[in-house]
Each structure stands twice: as C-alpha cells, then as structure tokens.
C-alpha cells in the first residue's frame, strides 16, 4: 500500500481521487488546497482536506505527492518548491518549456534527495512513449500527432488567467484532410496551423473588454499564436449546458519506410478516445506514482 497526497483540487485533482479509489494498493492521505478547506468537498470518506500551509506536517506520511495545477503559471512554481520536500509528479504540458521545467525540478529534487517525474500524462506522457517505440521500429519515417476533438485543460486554464475571463473551454480540433493524408501514407509536410484549429468558448466578466480578451488569446505564445483560433463569447448558462463535459483524445502516427529501396510504407498508430480527460490523466498519474514509490524504495 502506498500513500498519495493530492495538491490542488480542480478537475485533475478530482480525477486523481477517482483513480486512487480504483487502485487497491493506493491510499489517499489528504487533499491540499489553497482555498478554504471548509469549502472543498471530496468523495473519499475519512480523508481530510487541508490548506497547503499544513502540508509540511505530512512529510513522513505521503509517499508521492501528485501536483494538480495548471501548466501556465502553477506548475513552474509549485513543482520545484514541493520537490525539495516530497517525491512528486506533475502533468506539465507546455512542450516548448519542458527542458526548462525539467532543469528547475531536477535541481530542487536533488536538494531534498527526492524523486520527481514531470510532464506525465498522455501527451506528453503515453504519446511520448508511443513515438519512442515507433521510431525504434521504423527509424526511417515521419511522426505526426493529432489531438482532439476535445477539451484541453491546459489551454482552458491559460485562457481563464486572462484579465476579464470568468470561465473558458478550449477545444483542439484536428484538420480532417490532414489526418486522412497521413493515414493514407502520403507523408505530407504539415505546418502547425495545417494540423489543428482551436475553438475557444469564453464567459467574460461583466463589462470586460472582449476585444482585449480575444487578442490576448489569439496572440498567446506556445498556446494559440501558431493556430487558426476562433473565439466565441457565451453566457455562464450556455457554458454549463453545452460544455460541462471534458472529453479529449488523439493519435500518434508514424509513417515509415522499409526495404532496400524504401519501397514499402508502414503506418503505425496509437490512439485514445477519452470521455474524461482529467480522469484519464489522473489514472496515468497514479500509475506512475506507483513507479516513483518503487524507485524510491530501491534507492534509485
């Protein structure tokens, strides 16, 4: 039995809690929040909700702390700070900034002699492993990744941090013609813009500057600036009615060549279709938390 702490209790934190309940060898020690703990209700009976200020009291009671924050601003600060004191895992998904995040977390974990695993979800995460396997088998070829159609938690969180935004959902949508060309083994050369579009549904605060919000979204580096992005302003009622679910998915495809003249084409594909992005991501995090615990026990 290994003991898990959840740091942050939004959609992902709830997904981790649900995953812990389905794994017989895991125990939830506590949920830690920056909010007033009295306002946070969890599903696991007999488990406490604590303010993050109380976390240090649990240093010897938690085997792995699963950090459930946003990649835009939370995880770059949280994960290094917490890795000094706990074995930690996060799902940081800003691909362009992973090397920087790795260096910061690695330095912090070494200070506390802890193990830290970053960017562990399905992309980055399971999709990263799929690319590795496919490249090993087909060294001559081309990789393609398509996401969606589905809600990106990280991109939605990034929008919600813009001044004047009350709530937001961001859908990543693959360009159908591009997916078809890849699956047909045509090996197209595709720009970022040619592979996906982004659809944003935003609930603005009263009297917010809508033009400012739209511009901030469309020009946001690492998130939207390289894509054709549509921004739709809707009411809170429409958000609750039409965008409450959090589905997602996607495919990693490698089109490779074999033969002395590279005359044969092979298409390998690993795909996911998810009813709940946070619940699946939470399940991945719990699985890898188990590995962290085993590595730590072995002195790795």
Regions found by a protein language model. Give the residues of each.
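Short alpha-helices
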Residues: 110-135, 285
């Amino acid at each position: 039995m290994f003991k898990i702490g959840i740091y942050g209790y939004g959609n992902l934190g709830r997904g981790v809690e649900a995953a812990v309940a389905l794994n017989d060898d895991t125990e939830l020690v506590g949920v830690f929040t920056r909010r007033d703990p009295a306002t946070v209700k969890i599903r696991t009976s007999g488990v406490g909700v604590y303010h993050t200020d109380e976390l240090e009291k649990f240093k010897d009671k938690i085997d792995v702390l699963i950090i459930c924050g946003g990649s835009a601003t939370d995880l770059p600060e949280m994960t290094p700070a917490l890795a000094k004191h706990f074995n930690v895992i996060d799902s940081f998904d800003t691909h362009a900034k992973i090397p920087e995040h790795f260096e910061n977390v690695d330095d912090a974990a070494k200070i506390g002699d802890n193990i830290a695993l970053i960017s562990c979800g399905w992309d980055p995460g399971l999709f990263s492993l799929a690319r590795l396997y496919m490249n090993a088998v087909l060294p001559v070829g081309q990789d393609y990744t398509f996401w969606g159609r589905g809600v990106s938690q990280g991109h939605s969180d990034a929008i919600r941090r813009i001044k004047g935004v009350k709530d937001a959902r961001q859908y990543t949508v693959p360009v159908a013609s591009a997916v078809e060309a890849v699956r047909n083994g045509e090996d197209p050369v595709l720009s970022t813009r040619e592979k996906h579009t982004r659809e944003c549904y935003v609930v603005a605060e009263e009297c917010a500057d809508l033009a400012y919000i739209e511009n901030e979204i469309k020009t946001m580096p690492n998130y939207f600036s390289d894509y054709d992005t549509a921004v739709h302003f809707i009411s809170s009622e429409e958000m609750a009615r039409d965008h409450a679910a959090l589905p997602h998915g996607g495919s990693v495809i490698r089109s490779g060549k074999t033969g002395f003249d590279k005359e044969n084409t092979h298409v390998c594909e690993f795909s996911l279709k998810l009813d709940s992005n946070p619940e699946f991501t939470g399940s991945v995090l719990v699985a890898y938390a188990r590995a962290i615990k085993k590595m730590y026990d072995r002195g790795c």
